[in-house]
Amino acid sequence: MSAVAAMSWWQVISLAVVQGLTEFLPVSSSGHLAVVSRVFFSDDAGASFTAVTQLGTEAAVLVYFARDIVRILRAWFDGLVVTSHRNADYRLGWYVIIGTIPICVMGLLFKDEIRSGVRNLWVVATALVVFSGVIALAEYLGRQSRHVEQLTWRDGLVVGVAQTLALVPGVSRSGSTISAGLFLGLDRELAARFGFLLAIPAVFASGLFSLPDAFHPVTEGMSATGPQLLVATLIAFVVGLAAVSWFLRFLLRHSMYWFVGYRVVVGVVVLILLATGTVAAT
């Protein structure tokens, strides 16, 4: 691998589209960025590029869930002042806060490993295959009988802990949170919506934390300029908005078994490419 390679506009646009398409699907956006970067461009875009472009996809979540977010915030602040107004939305606000704590703690503790070692393609491919089994098991065992009024702080904590698994590229943030929700008996749409709401503070914090690093000179991998990062973030926003809308409609009628099969195929193909020396792991 070369020391530093400047990213072309074609690479920037391609990876931004990949980020937007895969951020909300249970297939791992960070894993796909690592795979696409190395298989097609022979180098890694890096964790900072991933984190900054995630700001675009998370902005898409803000737009898509704007009414829900405003309603929850109003209920939360209202409930702090008037105890008799503490409804399901007030409690949901607390569950998001509780669920955000685990990934913030783990992200700070293992930030160096996240930026380097775990982006190894052996890790990514293995996680794609292994965690597909977890998703399949969640679909098989999930009762899907609980609704938003039945959420508890324990649900927020469990889904929040599950979200920390997404720090490993190849696992998938939506895959881990939706699976946790299904194991807890939540219906599929609620598990997805709660997982997306839970991701907002964590991903924005990660993106803002990595923003200064993205503009500093790098010593290895691919390097994007400021204008390239801006364009990539905007593309990720547009594509991500379309993706989250499609995915939530998809979950109303379909299970995640489709994505289980996809993950296994991609993971096995990458493992074969690694085993034959066609692609470098780092």
Curated annotation (Swiss-Prot):
Which InterPro entries does this one have? Answer: UppP (IPR003824)
Report if keyword NAD is assigned. no
Q: What class of enzyme is it?
A: hydrolase
Kindly report the protein's main subcellular placement as a broad class.
membrane
| Annotated Gene Ontology cellular component terms | plasma membrane
Molecular function as annotated in GO: undecaprenyl-diphosphatase activity
- Tell me how this protein sits in the membrane: Multi-pass membrane protein
- Provide the alphabetized UniProt keywords: Antibiotic resistance, Cell membrane, Cell shape, Cell wall biogenesis/degradation, Hydrolase, Membrane, Peptidoglycan synthesis, Transmembrane, Transmembrane helix
- Example GO biological process term? peptidoglycan biosynthetic process
Q: Which residues cross the membrane?
A: 90-110, 121-141, 165-185, 194-214, 228-248, 256-276
Which reaction equation describes what this protein catalyses? Answer: di-trans,octa-cis-undecaprenyl diphosphate + H2O = di-trans,octa-cis-undecaprenyl phosphate + phosphate + H(+)
Q: Where in the cell is it found?
A: Cell membrane
Q: Pfam families attached here?
A: BacA
Its biological purpose:
Catalyzes the dephosphorylation of undecaprenyl diphosphate (UPP). Confers resistance to bacitracin.
Leftover remarks: Bacitracin is thought to be involved in the inhibition of peptidoglycan synthesis by sequestering undecaprenyl diphosphate, thereby reducing the pool of lipid carrier available.
Q: Give the UniProt family note.
A: Belongs to the UppP family.
Name the chain's protein: Undecaprenyl-diphosphatase
Q: Please give the organism.
A: Mycobacterium marinum (strain ATCC BAA-535 / M)
Which lineage ranks, top first, belong to the organism behind this chain?
Bacteria, Bacillati, Actinomycetota, Actinomycetes, Mycobacteriales
